């Protein structure tokens, strides 16, 4: 278990100590575990113990004092030998209106506890819960409820004791934890008029417990995902998105990142902190929200690296630059942890902004504020940080009606003897949410910020969002990808470009115009997330005629190979179904973070700005494959290979009769080639963690799936093949008039 690193700043607090300085003894091994040192054996070095999963170290850490002796934080007795002890989960103290089995004093990792209700009561929550290796129970609190109260029975979490048994409007319940367990969440909750309990469900946890990234990421990601979906200014109809850090379209988000730079962090961890923070900033700025970011590092004193009052706080490049310039030694002369001063810096920033905008103005009152505090929760100077939080709540006028305007997240990283009580005291308390967490190490922190944006929570039609987490399915990575088929035989692919329109290739429909039997499969066809849609209308480009140049000896010609399908129903947005961004639209402009007034030409210059542009298409088996789109002089050399194809074009004298400027070209030796059946699928790029369709698969000189019925089997062309593989894709920048004609009421197009 790594040192409890809770901030984005690692400071070497004792550089250049004299050779005469004492060093601490080296007989500090732990039975069954290992240890790390932040600064060797010198005074100021933090020793952190680690144990295998399912065990925890006792003590968790020791600090080398200036006297040359080790001290265990919080210990009153002399040093004892460090050992690894088994992790245990707390037992129920009581269970109302039911029984639980087995009845133990505490439960080992892997142990289960089961719940049953008495007659007349209905079980809500998890009937069986298992003790996890982090000392936390899986599942949800089991409650036996008869529905008689104005609010539902709030239950009693494992290890907790509750006083208060009335659940009417205005009634209160109070919680405390048994033995040495620590309470996180709300110690008191009130039944509100809307039938919901105030605050956050209390949890009693072992002092050594921590949270898994897969638990923290959804909790943070739900808040930010709702916020991102709620701030899409291009949505034409309002949808109810629920609470979370929700911002009205006329509003703005101030995001404050507070990074603790104390002696318990190392330089390597500091680099991971900065990388994680930069990743989070990059992800948030990749969505079309109005956001300003403040960055504050602190030890004994705070250092404001970026203020929300600075215009650059709205510029992702400037914000990330400020993070990158955060110096490991910025706080080397400060040995304390002054969380109060860091939060007070936020308060002063808010106060200055309120004076600038005017306390009574909508411009001030509609700003939402989110504070992410990365710390060990061990403030040891400057006063109580809760006082600063109270000042912040007061200046923002946070009450029941304005509770959504402030969220404070307190996140600890590592496993020192964390002051859970202080972390819990600082974090916001809101129904159904958690705002205080402890992560095991900096790697876990990086995972959280990388995967915190759960796109399944975006009910808006925000475009170009793929789930890139490690456990995401192929369909979740490319949720715009659809399959088009007549009855049962798959023929083509396509891409969702809105909640009701699919873009595909015209040649998929050249055998007839009756589409009543055709289906479009949206989502993962191999799971419950797949759904078939009827086609309400097919719009085929009138310029497409595969035999248009047959009398010139060109047996097949694929100019204007583009079509639109309007689905009979709108697609419900989810992690498995979401439109891709089309260039030259306001939706794509926001995703690219381009300024207002940008044009279609600006998008082309940004997306297709190199001689060889890395791009992707989706294979028959759903995987994402790589190609390189050739531009400029490389486009010419790529296309000229067609002259070697004597079967389709026996008398070709001018390559441009076949490969017009409507086509993008790929297929060099390192590229994958599309198979028959992959036509119509999107050719797309990634920019700023968003995906943009620049073309669609049309035709090629080589079929890597020929002769194989296995969707996972692709055969590369031999190097000696004549002609070598080449693939051609309709260039959407060259089809703008047609797209605007048919999608003008669906998408918001930019000037050409």
Swiss-Prot record:
Subcellular location: Secreted; Cell surface
Motif mapping: MIDAS-like motif: 260-264
Active-site residues, record numbering mapped to chain: 507 (charge relay system), 561 (charge relay system), 679 (charge relay system)
Catalytic class of the enzyme: hydrolase
Residues carrying sugar: 29, 112, 290, 333, 467, 471, 621, 651
Post-translation changes: Cleaved and activated by different proteases depending on the complement pathway to generate complement C2a and serine protease complement C2b chains. Cleaved and activated by C1S following activation by the classical complement system. Cleaved and activated by MASP2 following activation by the lectin complement system. Cleaved and activated by GZMK following activation by the GZMK complement system.
Disulfide bonds: 24-64, 51-84, 89-131, 117-144, 151-191, 177-204, 463-581, 492-508, 584-600, 638-665, 675-705
Sample GO molecular function, one term: serine-type endopeptidase activity
Pfam family name, one: VWA
Record key words, sorted: Age-related macular degeneration, Complement pathway, Disease variant, Disulfide bond, Glycoprotein, Hydrolase, Immunity, Innate immunity, Metal-binding, Protease, Repeat, Secreted, Serine protease, Signal, Sushi
GO BP: complement activation; complement activation, classical pathway; innate immune response; positive regulation of apoptotic cell clearance; proteolysis; response to bacterium; response to lipopolysaccharide; response to nutrient
Binding site for Mn(2+): 262, 264, 337
Start and end residues of each Sushi domain: 22-86, 87-146, 149-206
Purpose of the protein: Precursor of the catalytic component of the C3 and C5 convertase complexes, which are part of the complement pathway, a cascade of proteins that leads to phagocytosis and breakdown of pathogens and signaling that strengthens the adaptive immune system. Component C2 is part of the classical, lectin and GZMK complement systems.
PANTHER family: COMPLEMENT C2, SUSHI DOMAIN-CONTAINING PROTEIN
Protein name: Complement C2
Source species: Homo sapiens
């Amino acid at each position: 278990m790594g040192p409890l690193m809770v901030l984005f700043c690692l400071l070497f607090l004792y550089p250049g100590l004299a050779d005469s300085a004492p060093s601490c003894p080296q007989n500090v091994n732990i039975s069954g575990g290992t240890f790390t040192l932040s600064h060797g054996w010198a005074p100021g070095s933090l020793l952190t113990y680690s144990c295998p999963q399912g065990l925890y170290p006792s003590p968790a850490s020791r600090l080398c004092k200036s006297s040359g002796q080790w001290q265990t934080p919080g210990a009153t007795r002399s040093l004892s030998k460090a050992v690894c002890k088994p992790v245990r989960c707390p037992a129920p103290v009581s269970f109302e209106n039911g029984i639980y089995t087995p009845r133990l004093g505490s439960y080992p990792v892997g142990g289960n506890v089961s719940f049953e209700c008495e007659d007349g009561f209905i079980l809500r929550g998890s009937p069986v819960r298992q003790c996890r290796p982090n000392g936390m129970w899986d599942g949800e609190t089991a409650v036996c409820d008869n529905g008689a109260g104005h609010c539902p029975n709030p239950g009693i979490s494992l290890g907790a004791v509750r006083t208060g048994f009335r659940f009417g409007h205005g009634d209160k319940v109070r919680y405390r934890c048994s033995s040495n367990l620590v309470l996180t969440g709300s110690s008191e909750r009130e039944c509100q008029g809307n039938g919901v309990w105030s605050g956050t469900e209390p949890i009693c946890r072992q002092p050594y417990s921590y949270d898994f990234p897969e638990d923290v990421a959804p909790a943070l990601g739900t808040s930010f995902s709702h916020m991102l979906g709620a701030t899409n200014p291009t949505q034409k109809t309002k949808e109810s998105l629920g609470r979370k850090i929700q911002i009205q379209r006329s509003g703005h988000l101030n995001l404050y990142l507070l990074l603790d730079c104390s002696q318990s962090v190392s330089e390597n961890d500091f680099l991971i902190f900065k990388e994680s923070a930069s990743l989070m900033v990059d992800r948030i700025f990749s969505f079309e929200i109005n956001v300003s970011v403040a960055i504050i590092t602190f030890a004994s004193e705070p250092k404001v690296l970026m203020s929300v009052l600075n215009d650059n706080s709205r510029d992702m490049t400037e914000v990330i630059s400020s993070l990158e310039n955060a110096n490991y030694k910025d706080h080397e002369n400060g040995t304390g942890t002054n969380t109060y001063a860091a939060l007070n810096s936020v308060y002063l920033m808010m106060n200055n902004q309120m004076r600038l905008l005017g306390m009574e103005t909508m411009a001030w009152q509609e700003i939402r504020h989110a504070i992410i505090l990365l710390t060990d929760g061990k403030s040891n100077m400057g006063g109580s940080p809760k006082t600063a939080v109270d000042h912040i709540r007061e200046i923002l006028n946070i009450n029941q009606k304005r509770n959504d305007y402030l969220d404070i997240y307190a996140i600890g990283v590592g496993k020192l003897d964390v002051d859970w009580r202080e972390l819990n005291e600082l974090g916001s308390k809101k129904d159904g949410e958690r705002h205080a967490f402890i992560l095991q190490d900096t790697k876990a922190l990086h995972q959280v910020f990388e995967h915190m944006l759960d796109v399944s929570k975006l009910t808006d039609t925000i475009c170009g969002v793929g789930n890139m987490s490690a456990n995401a399915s192929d369909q979740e990575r490319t949720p715009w990808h659809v399959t088009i088929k007549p009855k049962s035989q798959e023929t083509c692919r396509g891409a969702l470009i809105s909640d009701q329109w699919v873009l595909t290739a015209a040649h998929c429909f050249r055998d007839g115009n009756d589409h009543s039997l055709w289906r479009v499969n949206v989502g993962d066809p191999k799971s419950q997330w797949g759904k078939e849609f009827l086609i309400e209308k097919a719009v085929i480009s009138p310029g497409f005629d595969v035999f248009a140049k047959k009398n010139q000896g060109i047996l097949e010609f694929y100019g204007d190979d583009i079509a639109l399908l309007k689905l009979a129903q709108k697609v419900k947005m989810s992690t498995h179904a979401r439109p891709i961004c089309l260039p030259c639209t306001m939706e794509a402009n926001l995703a690219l973070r381009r300024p207002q007034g940008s044009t279609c030409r600006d998008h082309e210059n940004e997306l297709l700005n190199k001689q060889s542009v890395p791009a992707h298409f989706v294979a028959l088996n759903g995987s994402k494959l790589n190609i390189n789109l050739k531009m400029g002089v490389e486009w010419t050399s790529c296309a000229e290979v067609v002259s070697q194809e004597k079967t389709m074009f026996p008398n070709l004298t001018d390559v441009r009769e076949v490969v017009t400027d409507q086509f993008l070209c790929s297929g060099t030796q390192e590229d994958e080639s599309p198979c028959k059946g992959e036509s119509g699928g999107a050719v797309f790029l990634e920019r700023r963690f968003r995906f943009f369709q620049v073309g669609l698969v049309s035709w090629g000189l080589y079929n890597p799936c020929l002769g194989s019925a296995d969707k996972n089997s692709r055969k590369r062309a031999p190097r000696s093949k004549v002609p070598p593989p080449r693939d051609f894709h309709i260039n959407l920048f060259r089809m703008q008039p047609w797209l605007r004609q048919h999608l003008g009421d669906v998408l918001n197009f930019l000037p050409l």
